[in-house]
Regions:
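Cell-envelope/ECM-targeting effectors and their regulatory/trafficking segments
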Residues: 2-167
Length: 167
């Protein structure tokens, strides 16, 4: 792809215009039509960061419309708030967007609560071995309760989120 303005790289264009891209995913740039479908797109890299969380939040909000166990109404902020600090080092596959606080101060996340409800496990909003094992089982992966970095389970999870496949 060649841009008429040589001072603006494709990467910078996609990064700076992704927020304001029209619904069609196109932006008129001078006389050139530029598409930005992959700007900030989720990739299946095996690390659960903010992009994975945003896609999960979107899916849980959609699922809430047909599954009364899931509350929905989640902000699309890519954040998993107030998680047990003891789970951080045990799960190196959980990266950006995770707020780790002391175990006695952790109050949980609404996103994790909805995920837990959807998986059919106790909904305290805290990621831990039980929730991770349930997610791994649903994904058809070894249920060891740990998300390594990179994690094969997170890769499968990301692929399901990308494809919209929840079966």
């Amino acid at each position: 792809m060649t841009l008429e303005n040589t001072g603006l790289s494709r990467r910078k264009l996609l990064r700076t215009t992704a927020i304001g891209v029209p619904a069609a995913g196109m932006l008129a740039f001078g006389s050139t039509l530029v598409t930005a479908p992959a700007a900030n797109a989720l990739t299946d890299d095996g690390y659960w960061g903010s992009e994975t969380t945003v896609e999960l939040q979107k899916r849980l909000n959609s699922i809430a419309a047909v599954n009364s166990a899931v509350e929905g109404g989640l902000p699309l902020d890519g954040q998993i708030d107030s998680q047990l600090a003891s789970q951080s080092s045990a799960n190196p596959g959980l990266t950006s967007g995770w707020q780790w606080v002391s175990d006695d101060a952790a109050s949980g996340s609404d996103t994790i609560k909805d995920l837990q409800r959807w998986l059919g496990v106790g909904a305290d909003g805290l990621i831990g071995p039980s929730t991770i094992s349930a997610l791994q089982s649903w994904l058809g992966q070894t249920a060891d309760g740990v998300l390594d970095g990179p994690s094969p389970a997170i890769v499968v999870f990301q692929r399901k989120l990308i494809e919209g496949n929840y079966s």
